[in-house]
């Protein structure tokens, strides 16, 4: 399993001894070979990755690890095959020793939309909830964040993060396989908390907001991205079944309803800083994510509707401060 000793030490330094002890007791089982049928294959691919020292690392403008020249005699196609063992790659893109990992999502576009509107990350401790493979966490580090902890329950996401961490060797960025419900309540130790693409998957969105609030120190900033619908303060859409072929979409609020939720949960300085209708260019199938994607989820005759006839995905980014 991955060595999280640096994480445990950092949590202790943050006054979170009990959480560090809890993670020490639970993470080994979550990351054991028996935890999923695919873990053995992932670990085999991980161990087969070649030892390469990147001559260049870029995290501020994009995520670039090394150059093609760093490969030397290493077979590029064999390296691609090892990376493909971690298919599907959903969040990115990554430039990995000259190999373009063209992920399903252009996560860099979302980052560019939100970065001008949030508190500067320099020196901050950040929690990234539902972080996927940690792409945005790398960008947070590139923006100067002192410490980034990503949480995501999907083991493939953690394995993809470990692929990058194998070469970046960043002791201040970690991704662990837990959900927000496994985080102890009222930690009050993070300067910034991100929750992007999570809220509408929660059966109790207000409980999720309280969980996020509990992780923040007083005066800390929440950055939340979620699906929204057009409408007034009373407008909240609950799909009667699937939404864009997803079974686990529960509540989609209007901007005004989302603002009210944040107010009722005790946040202040609330703002909707960006809205964006998801495009086929931003979310699509690629050679690195060969399953269905947005084009398959929309009405083929009306791009403003999902395949079920609901409003097509419209996303908003909110910022708010914990009192």
Curated annotation (Swiss-Prot):
One of its GO terms (biological process) is tRNA wobble uridine modification. Keywords: Transferase, tRNA processing. It is an enzyme of class 2 (transferase). SUPFAM superfamilies: S-adenosyl-L-methionine-dependent methyltransferases. The keyword tRNA processing applies. Carboxy-S-adenosyl-L-methionine binds at residues 91, 105, 110, 130, 180-181, 196, 200, 315. It catalyses: carboxy-S-adenosyl-L-methionine + 5-hydroxyuridine(34) in tRNA = 5-carboxymethoxyuridine(34) in tRNA + S-adenosyl-L-homocysteine + H(+). CDD domains: AdoMet_MTases. GO terms for molecular function: methyltransferase activity; transferase activity, transferring alkyl or aryl (other than methyl) groups. InterPro entries: CmoB (IPR010017), Mo5U34_MeTrfas-like (IPR027555), SAM-dependent_MTases_sf (IPR029063). The keyword Metal-binding does not apply. It comes from the Bacteria. Its EC number is 2.5.1.-. PANTHER family: METHYLTRANSFERASE, TRNA U34 CARBOXYMETHYLTRANSFERASE. Homotetramer. Catalyzes carboxymethyl transfer from carboxy-S-adenosyl-L-methionine (Cx-SAM) to 5-hydroxyuridine (ho5U) to form 5-carboxymethoxyuridine (cmo5U) at position 34 in tRNAs. Belongs to the class I-like SAM-binding methyltransferase superfamily. CmoB family. HAMAP family: tRNA_carboxymethyltr_CmoB. This is tRNA U34 carboxymethyltransferase. It comes from Geobacter sp. (strain M21). The gene is cmoB.
């Amino acid at each position: 399993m991955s060595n999280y000793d640096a994480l445990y030490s950092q949590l202790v330094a943050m006054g979170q001894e009990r959480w560090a002890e809890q993670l020490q007791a639970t993470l080994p089982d979550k990351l054991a070979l028996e935890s999923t049928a695919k873990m053995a294959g992932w670990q085999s691919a991980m161990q087969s990755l070649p030892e390469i020292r990147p001559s260049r690392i870029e995290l501020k403008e994009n995520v670039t690890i090394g150059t093609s020249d760093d490969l030397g005699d290493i077979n590029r196609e064999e390296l691609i095959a090892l990376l493909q063992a971690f298919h599907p790659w959903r969040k990115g893109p990554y430039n990995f020793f000259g190999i373009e990992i063209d992920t399903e999502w252009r996560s860099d576009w979302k980052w560019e939309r939100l970065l001008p509107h949030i508190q500067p990350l320099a020196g901050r401790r950040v929690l990234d909830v539902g972080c996927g493979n940690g792409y945005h966490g790398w960008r947070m580090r590139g923006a100067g964040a002192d410490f980034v902890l990503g949480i995501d329950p999907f083991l493939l996401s953690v394995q993809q993060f470990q692929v990058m961490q194998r070469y970046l060797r960043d002791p201040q960025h970690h991704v662990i396989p837990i959900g927000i419900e496994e985080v102890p309540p009222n930690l009050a130790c993070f300067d910034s908390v991100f929750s992007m693409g999570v809220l509408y998957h929660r059966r109790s969105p207000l409980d999720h907001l309280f969980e996020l609030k509990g992780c923040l120190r007083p005066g800390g900033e929440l950055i939340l991205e979620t699906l929204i619908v057009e409408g007034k303060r009373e407008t909240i859409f609950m799909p009667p079944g699937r939404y864009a072929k997803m079974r686990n979409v529960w509540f989609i609020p209007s901007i005004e309803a989302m603002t009210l939720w944040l107010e009722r949960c005790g946040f202040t300085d609330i703002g909707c800083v960006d809205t964006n209708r998801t495009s086929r260019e931003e979310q699509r199938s690629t050679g690195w994510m060969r399953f269905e994607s947005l084009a398959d989820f929309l009405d083929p005759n009306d791009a403003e509707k999902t395949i079920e006839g609901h409003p097509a995905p419209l996303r908003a980014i909110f910022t708010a401060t914990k009192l």
